[in-house]
Amino acid sequence: MKKFLFIITALFGLVFAQGVVTQLDNGSINYSDQSITAVGIGFVPTNAVNAGQARRMALRIAKQDAMRQLIEIVNGVTLTSETTMSGAMVDDVINTKVRGFIRGARPVGQPKYLSDTSVEMEYSVPMSGISDIILPPVTVPTPNQPGSDNASAAPGGDATQAGGVTGVIIDARGLKARPAMAPQILDQNGNAIYGPGKYSRKYAVENGVVGYSKTLEAAQKDQRVVGNPIVVKGVG
């Protein structure tokens, strides 16, 4: 089990700082920079008439393969402790929108031309696009929710100058917790203290409901809590 920290800001916006990545055979889910990547492989077709055409066709095949891999990876993304994207994808509208979004994936780096004449290409999509599709169309923030008009736009600001707490870092290392796009934080009585309704839709799409970190040092430098965050140990 990988160790990580998550951070709740003073406005109850959540961030798990950098470095938490789920590596897969065909790509990765980076919960730190909120991105999903997949590697596609293309082989030179036998009907290519010249080297230039062979390369173009191999790149096209690699992209198509990466799109298929991205769909597979997105299906496995954890939404909450109990659900994955595959559950949401049974909805035809969501399925169509997600597939359309994935078709707009951007290449990462340059193609890798392998000794067996195949080509590898990496493509990536931001989690924000997935959030924009699966989150309810309207989430009305309360005055203290991140993203509401009454919430501070920048962390640290007045609270830091006044010596107040700028955020809460919950140390989840050693727990059976796993990264998710939209986890809930519960108190010891099982009551939700962070989750749906505690943040605006706009905030969740633009910033992510959560972020991740492997180290306390990285968490303390996160811009949403930087200044004077407190650290609390998670218990379950």
Regions found by a protein language model. Give the residues of each.
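Domain-level marker for long, solvent-exposed, non-transmembrane regions
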Residues: 17-236
